[in-house]
Design a protein with these regions (language model features):
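Interfacial segments of alpha-helical transmembrane regions
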Residues: 31-38, 92-117
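Membrane-interface helix-loop-helix junctions at transmembrane boundaries of multi-pass membrane enzymes
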Residues: 20-29, 99-108, 174-178
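Hydrophobic alpha-helical transmembrane segments of polytopic
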Residues: 88, 92, 112, 180-187
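Alpha-helical transmembrane segments of multi-pass membrane proteins, especially transporters
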Residues: 62, 107-112, 206-210
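N-terminal transmembrane-helix/juxtamembrane module of multi-pass inner/ER membrane proteins
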Residues: 2-87, 124-142
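Transmembrane alpha-helix/helix-exit interface in multi-pass inner-membrane proteins
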Residues: 112-130
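Membrane-embedded catalytic cores of phosphoryl/pyrophosphoryl-handling enzymes
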Residues: 135-245
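Hydrophobic alpha-helical transmembrane segments
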Residues: 80-100, 156-160, 166
Length: 245
């Protein structure tokens, strides 16, 4: 009986190891392809930022700012209102910790604040000029550079990770699940338009900012899944050993 249990345990262990190798092979290939696509997109976006003439950026901003109806300015300010990265992340992390979601809290912090920090460093590197009030309407003048947009990068990394957590953790039949997912997706989609409308960034800043955020979000999600997978495998082996005692 003991020998049979040992054989079954060894078979399960070998099966887990095989599945792990197969999963890593597929996962590694997908990771390389995704990283290459994002890198190519980022290079293209950087070229767009460097080569697009100022006249085009000014015309695009004025076209967006020509749209006017009651409440639009307030709505755009609301969309951009979650851009204070440290405060927003701290509040959410406290909520996740209270729900015993320590792993999610850690990676949300790494994704949100990490993306924001990277964007701030790149701003100093590129030192590109922001829109000025002599050519477009500027609702608030920031002292930092225009590219990349810290708001865009933060929104993609932070709300993108929250989207992943909500999709994974909220029950499929919950009435709040679609509402939460749509809200997060809309915030990510509209923040670029809001920054353009408020005269905070040029149109050429947006593609690279979205792609930079997508790259860092992908890295954080990949690490999160690897950590979660390792913990699940350890738990499976522990339960298997306990079951054969």
């Amino acid at each position: 009986m003991f020998d049979t249990n040992v054989m079954l345990l060894k078979r399960n262990r070998d099966s887990v190891a095989f599945n792990k190798r197969e999963g890593l092979t597929r996962s590694s290939f997908a990771a390389v392809v995704t990283a290459c696509l994002i890198a190519a997109g980022a290079a293209f976006a950087l070229l767009v930022h460097l080569l697009v003439p100022l006249s085009f950026n000014v015309a695009a901003t004025l076209a967006v700012q020509s749209i006017s109806f009651p409440g639009l300015q307030e709505f755009m300010r609301l969309v951009s209102g979650f851009g204070n990265a440290p405060k927003v992340v701290i509040i959410t992390v406290i909520a996740l910790m209270a729900c015993n979601k320590r792993r999610e809290a850690f990676f949300l912090t790494a994704s949100g604040l990490g993306g924001w920090f990277i964007a701030m460093q790149l701003k100093h590197l590129f030192a590109s000029a922001r829109p000025t009030s002599d050519v477009v309407n500027v609702f608030h003048q920031w002292p930092t550079g225009s590219f990349p947009s810290g708001h865009l990068v933060f929104y993609v990394c932070y709300f993108g990770f929250l989207y992943f957590i909500a999709r994974e953790k909220l029950p499929a039949k919950s009435i709040f699940r679609p509402l939460v997912l749509v809200t997060l997706a809309v915030l990510i989609a509209l923040v670029g338009l809001s920054r353009l409308y408020l005269g905070e960034h040029w149109l050429s800043d947006l593609p690279g900012s979205y792609l930079l955020g997508a790259f860092w979000l992908y890295v954080c999600l990949k690490l999160y899944r690897l950590w979660a997978g390792a913990r699940d495998r350890q738990r499976f082996m522990a339960e298997s050993i306990a079951g054969y005692r």
